[in-house]
Amino acid sequence: MSNRVIIFDTTLRDGEQALAASLTVKEKLQIALALERLGVDVMEVGFPVSSPGDFESVQTIAKTIKNSRVCALSRALESDIDAAAQALSVAEQFRIHTFISTSTIHVENKLKRSFDQVLDMAVGAVKYARRFTDDVEFSCEDAGRTPIDNLCRMVEEAIKAGARTINIPDTVGYTVPSEFGGIIQTLFNRVPNIDQAVISVHCHDDLGLSVANSITAVQHGARQIECTVNGIGERAGNCSLEEIAMILSTRKGELGLETGINAKEIHRTSSLVSQLCNMPVQANKAIVGANAFTHSSGIHQDGMLKAQNTYEIMTPESIGLNRNNLNMTSRSGRHVIKHRMSELGYGEQDYDMDVLYEEFLALADKKGQVFDYDLEALAFMEAQAEDDDHFELQQLVVHSDSTEGSATATVKVAVNGETITEAATGNGPVDAAYKAVARASGCKTNITSYQLSAKGEGHNALGQVDITAKYREQNFHGVGLATDVVEASAKALIHVMNLTWRADKVADCKQRIQQNKQEFGSV
C-alpha cells in the first residue's frame, strides 16, 4: 500500500456552506489558485446543480486550475450528475463526487426508502457518472452511524459499479478514534474488492475529533483525507487541512505517511481564506493561530533562547512565517528583555538594565503585553505616565446623513496642551471622525486592521476598538473603550498617535546615542 495520502480539499464546497454570505466567483477563484499553490491533490469547488452561481464558479475554476484535480458534488440523481459533468467538462481531467445517505436514521427518516432501494440508487448513480469520467468518488453519507453489514455491502457494490474512491464520512462528528478506526479496518477485512479503490474519510468536528479520527483512519489503510483550510465547514467545522499536513510531516517517522502539500504556503493560504470568508482564526488555533508560535512563560522563553526545539516541535518558517514570538509580559525574565534590546540594536552600555527591568515589570503588570516601542520608550524617555499624552480627545460630535450614508464629525483635540477644533465629512461616522482627528493633529495614520468587540452584556456593554497602524516599518496597537463605537474608534486612533509620537522621540534618542558612539569612537 502506498504511503502517500491524497489531500482532498473541500473549502470551496463544504467550507463555504458555513459562511454568512456566499463568496463571489472571483473570490472562489482566488482561493482555488491558493489551494493549487498549496499543493492539494483534489479540490471540491461546488455543487453545480444548486444554483447558477455555483455552476459558474465550478466552470470558471475548472478552466483555470491545471495542477490539482477539480471536483464537483452531486446527489445520486442523474440531473445532479449532468450539471456537475457539464460544469467540469472544460477541464482536461475532473472528478464527479456523488453521494447518498446510508445510515438507518437517514434512510428511514430522510429518504423514506428501504436500504436495498438506496443501494440501487447508489449503484445507478456511480454507473451514470462513469459515462463522463473514470474518476468517480462515492460517499456513504453518515457512514459513522451506518450498520457495518450495510456499509460493507454499499462499499462493495459501489466499487463494482466503477467508483475509484470510496468516501467514509463521519457526517455528524459522532465517532471516537478507536471506533472510526475499527470501521475502516472492518472494511479492509470484509470488502473483497476494496483494493480496487482508494478509501477516503471526511470527518466533522462536532466533538472536536475530526483530525484525530482522520489520522486513525489513515493508520488503518485510508489514503485520502477530506479537509478544509482553517477547518471551516458545517456546524463545528471540518477536519483542518493545516493540522493534517503538519501532523503527517512532523510525525512522519512514527506514521510513515506523507502528502504533496507545500507547507510553506500554509500560513498565506490560511490568511487568505480567513480574510475572504470573513472568519477570523482563533488565536490558539493549532498551526495557524496567532499564538501558535508565541511564547509568554519566562521558563519557556529561556528554553527557546537556548534551543528552539525545547518548546517548538516545528518551526514557524516551515509554514511560511518568518519567526516565532517571545511575548514580553510580567512573566518574562531579564534575559528576554536583554535579548530583545539586542535584537533592536542596543548594547548593554546604552541603558541601565536594572532600571529598565523594574520599569518593564511595572508596565507589564499594568497593560499585560509590552511591545517593542514600549520597551524603547522605557529605556530612553524619562516620563512614561499616561497623563503625559501629546494628543488628547476632548470632544467628538457626529452627524450622520441616513439617506446618503455620509457623516460629518467635529472634534476638539488637545495637541501638546493646545486645543484645536476641526471638522470633516466621511463615508460613515468612523471615517469622518478619523479624518477630523487627522486634520486637528496633522498626523496621517496608516491603519492596517480594525476590530470591534463588546465588553460586558446588554445595554451596559462597552464597545472596544482595537486597531493596528503601520509607522516607520513598525506595527503600533491602539485600544479605545467607550459606550459609543465612534468614540471608542477615535480613542483608539488617539492612542496610536501618542505611541507613534513617543516613537519619534525614541528615534531622536537613538540618533543621539549613535552620534555619541561615533564621537567617542573618533577620539
UniProtKB/Swiss-Prot annotation:
Residues 5-267 form the Pyruvate carboxyltransferase domain. HAMAP family: LeuA_type1 (MF_01025). Its cofactor is Mn(2+). GO terms for molecular function: 2-isopropylmalate synthase activity; acetyl-CoA C-acetyltransferase activity; manganese ion binding. Mn(2+) binds at residues 14, 202, 204, 238. The keyword Manganese applies. It is an enzyme of class 2 (transferase). The gene is leuA. Keywords: Amino-acid biosynthesis, Branched-chain amino acid biosynthesis, Cytoplasm, Leucine biosynthesis, Manganese, Metal-binding, Transferase. Pfam families: HCS_D2, HMGL-like, LeuA_dimer. Pathway: Amino-acid biosynthesis; L-leucine biosynthesis; L-leucine from 3-methyl-2-oxobutanoate: step 1/4. GO terms for cellular component: cytosol. GO terms for biological process: L-leucine biosynthetic process. Disulfide bonds: none annotated. The keyword Metal-binding applies. It is found in: Cytoplasm. Catalyzes the condensation of the acetyl group of acetyl-CoA with 3-methyl-2-oxobutanoate (2-ketoisovalerate) to form 3-carboxy-3-hydroxy-4-methylpentanoate (2-isopropylmalate). This is 2-isopropylmalate synthase. Its EC number is 2.3.3.13.
